[in-house]
UniProtKB/Swiss-Prot annotation:
Catalytic activity reported: N(2)-formyl-N(1)-(5-phospho-beta-D-ribosyl)glycinamide + L-glutamine + ATP + H2O = 2-formamido-N(1)-(5-O-phospho-beta-D-ribosyl)acetamidine + L-glutamate + ADP + phosphate + H(+)
Family: Belongs to the FGAMS family.
Gene, per the UniProt record: purL
Gene Ontology annotations of biological process type: 'de novo' IMP biosynthetic process
Residues noted as binding Mg(2+) 2 in the record, renumbered to the chain: D110, D265
Statement: the UniProt record of this protein carries the keyword Transcription regulation: no
Function according to Swiss-Prot or TrEMBL: Part of the phosphoribosylformylglycinamidine synthase complex involved in the purines biosynthetic pathway. Catalyzes the ATP-dependent conversion of formylglycinamide ribonucleotide (FGAR) and glutamine to yield formylglycinamidine ribonucleotide (FGAM) and glutamate. The FGAM synthase complex is composed of three subunits. PurQ produces an ammonia molecule by converting glutamine to glutamate. PurL transfers the ammonia molecule to FGAR to form FGAM in an ATP-dependent manner.
Endpoints of the signal sequence: none
Protein name stated in the entry: Phosphoribosylformylglycinamidine synthase subunit PurL
Subunit-level organization: Monomer. Part of the FGAM synthase complex composed of 1 PurL, 1 PurQ and 2 PurS subunits.
Catalytic activity, EC: 6.3.5.3
One Pfam family from the record: AIRS
Pathway(s) this gene product operates in, as recorded in its UniProt entry: Purine metabolism; IMP biosynthesis via de novo pathway; 5-amino-1-(5-phospho-D-ribosyl)imidazole from N(2)-formyl-N(1)-(5-phospho-D-ribosyl)glycinamide: step 1/2
Organism: Campylobacter lari (strain RM2100 / D67 / ATCC BAA-1060)
Length: 725
């Protein structure tokens, strides 16, 4: 085969030799395209699988861990929560509206294909410098396009987007991150899996017709960007949320029957990945008649049909004899449905075109036994250069505070979350903007389901292992602050070019941090995604392992607020402040540095803090609780006051005034109802605590900082809109 064609398919010399060994001959173009997609980083996880294998994935409440379309946990009274987070970074950078919209569509399908109705969405967004003279305007365009795409798709689907995070840093100038999370619920007995078994069982294509959009998407998402990447725009899929809504309702109707064996979303690599994954999981073979595929465009080829990433499509393995009943359901909802193949016992994928065999590929070497790479790793040299950094506050705490409050990483993101419908389905208890975790009521069992998503990329740059562990601890802490017990996580691991040994070292360390934290905190990994090649012109993003956590309280009425109210009688700090300025926002703003060292996570102290929060909430001692994050105590208090429309008069006992900005983990601000009961309770449980102060009607006073509540709110609520223009 022509070497240029092989190169265009991102197949290495070693991989091509392996293809020859597997097939026993030269591949044709169709076979090369299929193998290229299945062996892409996006589909095969060939660089990352080695490090993912040790993740803790089991617990009594885990029903389904990694390996399916989404993870599943038991949330009580025979109900399950189905959830996953994944990336759509590369398409969103090329075409922000369409890329973000189809990212939402893809994650929704991953959840409802398991048999669950989607009840909540979240997102984690990272953009570059919006103030830069050269690229600031483009970054603002990306922000607006991505947010518009997410809101368009989610709102049209009738799925509440209830939370998320949005951060900005120069490391994302050339590669933005768009990570989408979805959660659904169903009865445990009604969960469906992606399998294709039973010789002769029909394979049915359902959903929208196949077009040429998204061709080569999986391969594109497995490569770095450069100046010519704008030409990749045709590889970004086009989404139709109204078609997806019909598809979801049709699938949920189908799931009430006994007509099917398994079902799989057509995501990256389209018909290729769905067919190979279903057959591969089941140890089966499959025969596909590609000319039977519903087509949107004329003259489409087998290559295009196998690799198109047109949206809103599913592949079903039905029980023989029930195929017409399946088709009838989808036709009723105005969707295409066609029998395009059947299950075999050959262990091979047989591809036919108008009766002619045009492709014959063994399934296992492309699915369950795809190549795994052992890439070289090297500790980055920059770590030695940054570790000795020490932060010194050289301006007044008042000035530092106002700079932090006005920073785009702190200021309120109402511009974003007000575009999302957070109350549709009428289950939302805490949505975006309410600080901390987001919560919904599950009407079927009246439980509180809380979820949070986060990644502090600066911490992961300073120490990839501790930074990843800190993300796991932080989302769990937010869940506990909402009154729910953290149960499990889903991860989306965003890193740079795996061909760079320093990036692979960061990735390996990040995985170690997640393994350690999940094991110690008893929050297993149930689903996830890896996004590599987040690099442009040789510049990689900071390591960014996004972690989403889900937790439960059996009583929905036990939801705990994240900011003060008139019922707050006193304000307390829980946890120990250790002067951790490594990777802090204050260091980035004042010294223009992402440097220093991180404190190890004290997992026993973390668990003790979670336990206290849950028990104190159960005892009705707390009015509110909020995990301390970027900007430290000062910014956490400021947000709680701004949201509550209440001031405070507070004082710390720190010898170093700058400690109000440090970012030590395992700390929480609580507003207490009954101070006497609180002190008794906190002493009994052995939690480190210190009184900060009380509410104030008009001013925000913290040590040397004094600002009117009105001015604080103006800065906090208005700055982000000013920046976007």
């Amino acid at each position: 085969m022509d070497k240029e064609i092989i190169k265009q398919h991102k197949i290495s010399d070693e991989e091509y030799q392996e293809i020859l060994n597997i097939l026993g001959r030269e591949p044709n173009l169709l076979e090369l395209g299929v193998i290229s997609a299945m062996w892409s980083e996006h589909c095969s996880y060939k660089s990352s699988k080695k490090y993912l294998s040790g993740f803790p994935t089991k617990a009594p409440w885990v029903i389904q861990g990694p390996g399916e379309n989404a993870g599943v946990i038991d949330i009580g009274k025979k109900m399950a929560a189905v959830f996953k987070v994944e990336s759509h970074n590369h398409p969103s950078f090329i075409e922000p509206f369409a890329g973000a919209a189809t990212g939402v569509g893809g994650i929704l399908r991953d959840v409802f294909t398991m048999g669950a109705r989607v009840v909540a969405g979240m997102n984690s967004l990272k953009f570059g410098n919006i103030h830069d003279e050269k690229i600031g305007k483009h970054q603002k365009y990306l922000v607006k396009g991505v947010v518009s795409g997410i809101s368009h798709y989610g709102n049209c689907m009738g799925v509440p987007t209830i939370g998320g995070e949005c951060a900005f840093d120069e490391c994302f100038n050339g590669n933005i991150l768009v990570n989408a999370f979805a959660l659904g619920t169903c009865k445990i007995k009604d969960i469906f899996y992606a399998k294709a078994e039973g010789i002769g069982n029909p394979v049915i294509y359902v959903g929208s017709k196949t077009g040429r959009d998204g061709l080569g998407g999986a391969v594109m998402a497995s490569d770095s960007f450069n100046e010519s990447s704008k030409s990749l725009r045709p590889t970004v899929q086009i989404g139709d949320p109204f078609a997806e809504k019909l598809l979801m309702e049709a699938c949920l109707e189908l799931f009430k029957t006994d007509y099917i064996v398994g079902i799989q979303d057509m995501g990256a690599a389209g018909l290729t990945s769905s067919s190979f994954e279903m057959a591969g999981r089941s140890g089966s073979g499959m025969r596909l008649y590609l000319d039977k595929t519903p087509m949107r465009e004329e003259g489409m080829t087998p290559y295009e049909l196998m690799l198109s990433e047109s949206q809103e499509r599913m592949l079903i393995c039905a029980k023989k004899g029930y195929e017409e009943k399946v088709i009838e359901i989808f036709n009723k909802w105005g969707l295409d449905a066609a029998i395009i193949g059947e299950v075999t016992d050959s262990g091979k994928m047989e591809l036919f075109w108008h009766g002619e065999l045009v492709g014959l590929i063994p399934i296992e070497p492309l699915s369950e036994k795809a190549p795994i790479l052992d890439r070289p790793v090297a500790r980055p040299k920059y770590l030695d250069e940054i570790k000795n950094y020490k932060f010194n506050l050289n301006i007044s705490t008042q000035e530092a505070f106002e700079k932090l409050l006005a920073n785009e990483n702190v200021s309120n993101k109402a511009y974003i979350y007000e575009q999302f419908d957070s109350s549709v389905q009428t289950n939302t208890l805490k949505s975006d903007g309410a600080l901390g975790a987001n919560s919904i009521r599950i009407k079927e069992n009246n439980c509180l389901l809380s979820m949070a998503i986060e990644c502090n990329s600066r911490l992961n740059y300073v120490n990839p292992k501790i930074g990843a562990a800190a993300a796991v601890a932080s989302v769990g802490r937010k869940i506990a602050c909402s009154g729910a017990k953290p149960l499990a996580i889903s991860d989306c691991l965003n890193y740079g070019n795996p061909q760079n040994p320093e990036v692979m070292w960061q990735f390996a360390q990040g995985c170690e941090g997640i393994k350690l934290a999940c094991k110690e905190l008893n929050t297993p990994v149930v689903s996830g995604n890896v996004s590599l090649y987040n690099e442009t012109d040789g510049v990689s993003i900071f390591p960014s392992p996004t972690i989403a956590c889900v937790g439960v309280n059996e009583k929905a009425e036990n939801v705990l607020k994240s900011y003060f109210s008139k019922d707050t009688s006193a304000i307390y700090l829980l946890g120990e402040s250790k002067g951790s300025f490594g990777g802090s926002l204050i260091a980035k703003i004042l010294d223009k540095k992402v440097a220093g060292e991180l404190e190890d996570i004290d997992f026993s102290a973390e668990l003790k803090l979670w336990d206290f929060l849950l028990k104190a909430n159960e005892a009705k001692i707390l009015d509110c609780a909020n995990s301390i994050g970027i900007g430290g105590i000062a910014i956490t208090l400021a947000k709680m006051c701004a949201m509550a429309n209440l001031g405070i008069n507070a004082k710390t006992n720190f010898a170093d005034k700058s400690f109000i900005f440090e970012e030590s983990p395992t700390r929480v601000i609580v507003g207490v109802k009954d101070e006497e009961e609180f002190i008794k309770f906190v002493n009994e449980m052995g939690i480190n605590f210190a009184k900060l102060g009380n509410l104030d009607e008009k001013d925000f006073i913290l040590d040397d900082i004094k600002i009117s509540l009105a001015k604080l709110q103006t800065i906090y609520f208005d700055k982000f809109n000013e920046y976007l223009g």
